[in-house]
Amino acid sequence: MSLHDSSGESVDARNLFTETAKLLMDGNIIAVKGIGGIHLASLATRDDVLEKFRRRKDRKNQPYALMSPDMDSIRSYALMNPVEEAHIQGWKRPVVLLRKRHRVISELVAPGLDTVGVMLPYTGIQTMLFKRFDEPALVMTSGNRRGLPMAITNEAAFSELGGLADYFLLHNREIINRSDDSVLRVIRGKPAFTRRSRGYVPDPINISISKGIGFAFGAELRNAAAIGTNGKVFMTQYLGDITSLEGVESEEKAIQAMRDLLNITCNPDVIACDLHPDYMTSQMAEVMSQEMDVPLVRSQHHHAHITSVMAENDIKNEEVLGIALDGAGYGEDGQIWGGEVLKSTYSGYKRVGQLEYVPMPGGDLCAYYPYRMLISSLTKQLSDDEIRDITGNHIDSALPHGPQERDIILNHARRKDILQTSSSGRFLDSISALIGLSYNRTYEGEPAMLLEALASRGTPDSVNFSPEIVNKGGKYILNTSNVLKYLIDKDNRYKKEDVAAFGQ
């Protein structure tokens, strides 16, 4: 083991753990090499340290995971039920999302949220480090630059994390397979994964419908690939966003590592990818399909969500009614889906319900600036002048270019050739913007997560309104723009937490 400063020079210390603990207590950020990658660690109790950390990592509000030395330390700042305790203490050592308790840790660990992700030490280095000081928790987050996978080599630690970390606590053991920490929350007594990775991979998921060998490349964001064989699906570790060359190389390596582990030397019988033609994962699948002369199956995003749940629950090839709610997925009609009711079998589906289509002026900009989505939705209910009047008091803080940007949005939203979305994520963003909770998304899902935290203190039945559902040609459509108009008409009648709970 070795300890280095930001220039890469070795730090002469009698005891590396004692010295590292002292550096942490002084407010330094330390890169700590583990077994699946390199973490960035800091104190979790000082606002000034967290402010510095966020500036360097360019993560304004995204929640950080915490590592605590023992269960009593966790109980000092979080609430746990017996099932959550069992997962935290289990040998797989995931990050478990828990309800916040007293403000022992800095609010800047997870700003605006009512939960915090917590894990116990799972390596000797982490255990020895906690023996050297008396802190309830350390921030322990993935060591990576934005858009890049987590660093796993000592060389990458210095080249990629230089400027982020003040010191580097490293060892000479090679990390073969990058593996982020797994993240889960307990819902109705069962674990629901936000990220399935270290500790859970390569445990297979048993399914009874699998025939032959299949490779699946997944979507582009929050990716994991998979190999199906002999009635089992072996998912790769969490790979993050596949939007860079480094991300592509990471997925290629993960698939090959899984093939080697399973001793699969032959070509697969089929290759699957998302329906979206521009995803880098789809293009990777196309190339492999052509090189191996293997059929390529393009799966609609939300149909894949539903059939994966069917497979996990051992539902045979029977028709089910599935609901898929998320931020975005490429639809068969070229629009952006995300609030879907699909009558599904494994081989096909019929779209029988959806959220109302709403224009997306500026495309993905709507996901980063929720007020864009709110304005666009209101064009289906109100005139431009009415929208200008409603948004007048907030527009300068809600949009980077204020009234001028609003007028461009209004103009584009009424064009017939504009991209449309039925996304539940964008609808929740609109409510978040409406009650002034989030105007600028700094990480994926932030407006909806803030809304969820606020909703935990509200009562949904306090909002006396039943959303309109209309039948158009055998398809049921929930009118989301009318919900927003109603909430505006009842301005200040309802508490924000009740509106948030109603929207959820």
Where are these regions (language model features)?
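Conserved phosphate-binding/catalytic loops in two-lobed NTP-binding clefts
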Residues: D274, D293-H305
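A contiguous, well-structured pocket-lining segment that forms one wall/lid of small-molecule binding clefts
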Residues: A219-A257, T379-Q504
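Short, hydrophobic/aliphatic alpha-helical segments
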Residues: A13-I29, M128-E135, E312-A324, P403-I418
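Active-site-adjacent structural elements in enzyme catalytic cores
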Residues: M1-A272, H276-E291
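Generic recognition of stable, solvent-exposed alpha-helical segments in well-folded globular domains
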Residues: N15, D48, P69, G124, ...
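Active-site histidine-anchored catalytic micro-motif
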Residues: M310, I315-T379, A413-R414, Q420-S422, ...
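Cap/lid and interdomain-hinge subdomains that line or gate substrate/regulatory clefts
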Residues: M1-L3, L98-R103, V109-A110, G117-Q126, ...
